[in-house]
């Protein structure tokens, strides 16, 4: 019995070692790709293999970053865009989930709205930007609305599908004990669909950034989207690349935050 336990412990240690080794390899390759990309970009710019005026260089972007941080202008742009994106992200996810719950509650409503959801999902949401600006005015409200609307429909479709795919046996058991529909939704449907909702959050991170940046392209006088447009207008592509890199960093941080939420939720269920 003791030998059996020691064998299991040894196998578990070997498994953990392999997992750590694999994780280290993945991180090493990720770091190597990162270094190669920026090194290649810098060398190509210095050697004239690419036009430094158009493609800039990491060193030029870094110098501009320090300059913008020094005068304090960059933080205000980041703050505005981050506020709009997070709010649009939360609103889009919340409204999409609520609409999905409404469709689950009423099969008739789901059948009525189904073709319209398909059509709206096929439409390029970015094209709604000018309409939102006219309807809501050229303000941060229209930008937040853009960040929310771009993710509402896909959230509704994905979450509603997850609601529909919950095992009917669970709901039948609840009905047998006389549970009301809202109790079934709260105790069975919503918890069982949590993985799909969290997966939707991951998708919505990118969609919200797209919606907000496009909104800032159209109306804003502040924000990272405005910095990109201004950079194009004055032919300052270093400013454009700086803005894009900042967007990439914060989008990654938001995505990592959702992944952390997913891990905590998974750990809480086990």
Swiss-Prot record:
GO terms for biological process: transmembrane transport. Keywords: Cell membrane, Membrane, Transmembrane, Transmembrane helix, Transport. The keyword Transmembrane helix applies. It comes from the Bacteria. SUPFAM superfamilies: MetI-like. Gene3D superfamilies: MetI-like (1.10.3720.10). Disulfide bonds: none annotated. Residues 74-255 form the ABC transmembrane type-1 domain. The keyword Iron does not apply. The chain crosses the membrane at residues 24-44, 85-105, 117-137, 140-160, 188-208, 209-229, 234-254. It is a multi-pass membrane protein. It is found in: Cell membrane. GO terms for cellular component: plasma membrane. Part of a binding-protein-dependent transport system. Probably responsible for the translocation of the substrate across the membrane. PANTHER family: ABC TRANSPORTER PERMEASE, ALKANE SULFONATE ABC TRANSPORTER-RELATED, MEMBRANE SUBUNIT. Belongs to the binding-protein-dependent transport system permease family. This is Uncharacterized ABC transporter permease protein YtlD. It comes from Bacillus subtilis (strain 168). The gene is ytlD.
